C-alpha cells in the first residue's frame, strides 16, 4: 500500500530535489515520484526520493 495519497492536492517534496504534484507527503514509495520509477530495483518500498534518475543516488 502506497503511504502517499497522491489524490490529495498539494505538492510532494521527496528528498532534496524530487518534486511531484497531487501529493501531500514528504516521503514516498517509488510509485509516487518520477525519480523512483516502478522498474527501479534500487528504490525499495518506502524509499525517500533524492534525485530524478534511476541510479544509486535516486533513493536513500
UniProtKB/Swiss-Prot annotation:
A divalent metal cation 1 binds at residues 4, 6, 20, 23. A divalent metal cation 4 binds at residues 32-33, 43, 47. PROSITE patterns: METALLOTHIONEIN_VRT (PS00203). Residues 1-28 are annotated as: Beta. It comes from the Eukaryota. A divalent metal cation 5 binds at residues 33, 35-36, 49. A divalent metal cation 6 binds at residues 36, 40, 43, 59. Pfam families: Metallothio. A divalent metal cation 2 binds at residues 6, 12, 14, 25. Belongs to the metallothionein superfamily. Type 1 family. Metallothioneins have a high content of cysteine residues that bind various heavy metals. This is Metallothionein B. It comes from Dicentrarchus labrax.
